[in-house]
């Protein structure tokens, strides 16, 4: 492993672990109105991130108009879209099933890097993608379906899969940015743009509901979501992914379903079987192979 990439790899691994914990937090927040839950999350995160920018005296980023539009698109698709679809899906399916479904993210991320960004994957890179996908298949086989094949359960799984597709786009859109942006500024912009996008819908939901009405555990889950995955996770991911190829970054998303499943099992007292541990081993092997890949130049044309 290249020593100069040690920090980017560690940052992306930690970021994906925090993203995996959103499965637990989102399941706890599922009782809240969707946009109200997101409003609480992004409001807390935005205040913390803006305070950090002020304390650290980070200069305002100078970006082209096209880059500002791209950032808004990232916030809409990968932040608001992912959160809304995940919260809706977790209201219909189990946390363990949702964790397993996120196993589609490594393959989607790497393939988008190939077909959208024009990057090339070596045979080792394709092998890493295959291992990551196989790990998630094993996790799904080991877990089985906890909700049967009814329409509600399948609908929840479909919503979670749609959220995963949003996340895959989100993780790669920043590769389209022409100017370098400080990771802390990137996290702050994503959070504040997301807050602005979901605020009108949250106000409508609060008005229709006659004011806030949810448990303290759901509110604390929203605060955790804001401080750890949204604030710390955004910063870690942008710190790491800005220094490696999109395909390499995509491999690290194999940690999302692994951490999601293990944290769901720990929090909700769900059993973890030997097949799950085997799946974890394959996911880790995929990361080892992925980090050994040398970045390839974009395809000509």
Which residue stretches match the model-derived regions?
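Specific transmembrane alpha-helical segments of multi-pass solute transporters/efflux pumps
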Residues: 18, 22-23, 50, 54-102, ...
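Helix-helix packing/entry segments at the starts of transmembrane helices
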Residues: 12, 40, 79, 83, ...
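Hydrophobic/aromatic residues within transmembrane alpha-helices
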Residues: 29, 37, 41, 89, ...
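Transmembrane alpha-helices of multi-pass small-molecule transport proteins
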Residues: 31-81, 108-109, 165-173, 187-206, ...
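Glycine-/small-residue-enriched transmembrane alpha-helix faces in small-molecule transporters
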Residues: 1-39, 147-176, 184, 197-198, ...
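Cytoplasmic-side transmembrane-helix entry/capping segments in multi-pass membrane proteins
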Residues: 12, 66-74, 121-133, 181-190, ...
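Juxtamembrane helix-entry segments on the extracytoplasmic side of multipass membrane proteins
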Residues: 4-8, 31-39, 63-69, 141-166, ...
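Hydrophobic transmembrane alpha-helices of multi-pass small-molecule transport proteins
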Residues: 49, 112, 121-143, 254, ...
């Amino acid at each position: 492993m290249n020593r100069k990439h040690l920090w980017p790899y560690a940052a992306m691994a930690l970021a994906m672990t925090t993203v995996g914990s959103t499965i637990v937090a989102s399941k706890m927040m599922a009782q809240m109105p969707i946009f109200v839950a997101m409003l609480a999350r992004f409001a807390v995160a935005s205040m913390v991130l803006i305070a950090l920018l002020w304390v650290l005296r980070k200069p305002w980023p100078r970006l082209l108009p096209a880059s500002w539009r791209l950032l808004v698109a990232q916030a809409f698709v990968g932040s608001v879209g992912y959160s809304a679809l995940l919260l809706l899906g977790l209201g219909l399916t189990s946390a363990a099933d949702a964790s397993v479904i996120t196993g589609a993210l490594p393959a989607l991320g790497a393939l988008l890097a190939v077909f959208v960004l024009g990057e090339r994957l070596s045979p080792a890179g394709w092998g890493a993608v295959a291992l990551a996908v196989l790990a998630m298949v094993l996790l799904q086989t080991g877990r089985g379906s906890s909700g049967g094949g009814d329409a509600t359960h399948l609908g929840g799984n479909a919503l979670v899969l749609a959220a995963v597709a949003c996340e895959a786009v989100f993780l790669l859109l920043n590769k389209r940015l022409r100017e370098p942006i400080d990771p802390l500024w990137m996290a702050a912009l994503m959070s504040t743009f997301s807050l602005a996008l979901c605020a009108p819908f949250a106000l409508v939901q609060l008005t229709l509901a006659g004011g806030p009405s949810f448990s303290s555990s759901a509110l604390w889950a929203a605060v955790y979501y804001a401080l750890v995955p949204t604030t710390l996770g955004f910063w870690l991911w942008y710190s790491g992914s800005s220094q490696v190829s999109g395909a390499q970054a995509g491999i690290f998303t194999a940690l999302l379903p692994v951490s999601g499943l293990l944290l769901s099992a720990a929090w909700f007292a769900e059993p973890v079987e030997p097949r799950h541990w085997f799946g974890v081993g394959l996911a880790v092997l995929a990361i080892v192979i992925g980090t050994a890949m040398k970045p390839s130049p974009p395809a000509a044309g």
